[in-house]
Regions:
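Structural signature of beta-strand start/N-cap positions in the alpha/beta core
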Residues: 45, 72, 110-113, 134-137
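Conserved HGGG/HGGXW glycine-rich cap/lid loop of the alpha/beta-hydrolase fold
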Residues: 33-83
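Conserved catalytic-core motifs of eukaryotic protein kinase domains, centered on the activation segment
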Residues: 58-60, 84-90, 149-152
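Alpha/beta-hydrolase fold catalytic core
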Residues: 1-46, 68-71
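Flexible "cap/lid" loop of the alpha/beta hydrolase fold
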Residues: 122-130, 135-167
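Catalytic nucleophile serine of serine hydrolases
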Residues: 84, 118, 142
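Alpha/beta-hydrolase
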Residues: 167-179
Length: 179
């Protein structure tokens, strides 16, 4: 049976895996929103970007593994998700990429590896496309960067994300089948 909850963050914190304790967390103001982040461990930074309607706690199983492997794991709640606020601007991956850069700047991170799923994957590709000098590498999955099988909802999907995916991964990479 599938259950639905009005406040998924509260439910997940009570019923799902929880992030480890950390004193390194807070908010960064960027373009009208307060963006929440938490950092764990030390070493080379790895940014973890969640999917739409998710939050940083969705990475609770991965954070300890990254820390034990010698990485500094940073989770970020996208604007309007989890603990982060939003303003009246429409959501866009470009805007969310600037939120990630603002967190990187606040934490004095020059360059980081980025892992993202779904909307977090789209944001990571936009980030790598716009400011490749700040991105050591991108691991992305469940990313809808090729809209050919979806109903067109505007130039946002067709323009920005496809261009970003092609510039980072190349069009042939997006068409490869997993065997």
């Amino acid at each position: 049976m599938i259950e639905s909850h009005d406040d998924e963050l509260t439910w997940f914190e009570a019923e799902g895996a929880s992030l480890p304790e950390t004193e390194e967390q807070g908010f960064v103001e960027n373009d009208g929103a307060q963006i929440w982040y938490a950092a764990f461990g030390s070493g080379s930074p790895v940014l973890l970007l969640h999917g739409g309607l998710g939050h940083g706690g969705n990475w609770a199983y991965q954070v300890p593994v990254l820390v034990e492997s010698g990485y500094r794991a940073i989770v970020i709640d996208s604007r309007g998700h989890g603990r982060s606020t939003r303003d009246t601007q429409p959501y866009s991956y470009d805007l969310m990429a600037t939120d990630v850069l603002a967190v990187m700047d606040a934490l004095n991170i020059e360059k980081a590896a980025v892992a993202g799923w779904s909307d977090g994957a789209c944001t990571s590709l936009i980030l790598a496309s716009k400011d490749s000098s700040r991105v050591a590498g991108v691991f992305f999955y469940a990313c809808n960067m090729d809209p050919s099988g979806t109903k067109e909802t505007g130039t946002f999907i067709r323009g920005n994300t496809t261009t970003a995916a092609n510039s980072v991964a190349g069009p042939s990479c997006l068409r490869q089948k997993i065997r």
